Amino acid sequence: MKVQPSVKRICDKCQVVRRKGRVLVICSNPRHKQRQG
């Protein structure tokens, strides 16, 4: 899980999701997991 000031989609399977006020990127590739913070 990368914590970054701005999250971006890296590949086509990345999805930007809002959960509990946080912006997350979930993907089938675990290296692409990101959280805004």
From Swiss-Prot:
**Family to which the UniProt record says this protein belongs:** Belongs to the bacterial ribosomal protein bL36 family.
Q: Which GO terms describe its biological process?
A: translation
- Any idea which UniProt keywords this protein has? Ribonucleoprotein, Ribosomal protein
Q: Which NCBIfam families match?
A: rpmJ_bact
CC per GO annotation: cytoplasm; ribonucleoprotein complex; ribosome
Superkingdom classification of source: Bacteria
Record-linked InterPro entries = Ribosomal_bL36 (IPR000473), Ribosomal_bL36_sp (IPR035977)
Gene Ontology MF annotations: structural constituent of ribosome
- Do you know which PANTHER family this protein is assigned to? 50S RIBOSOMAL PROTEIN L36, CHLOROPLASTIC, LARGE RIBOSOMAL SUBUNIT PROTEIN BL36C
- Quote the protein name from its UniProt record: Large ribosomal subunit protein bL36
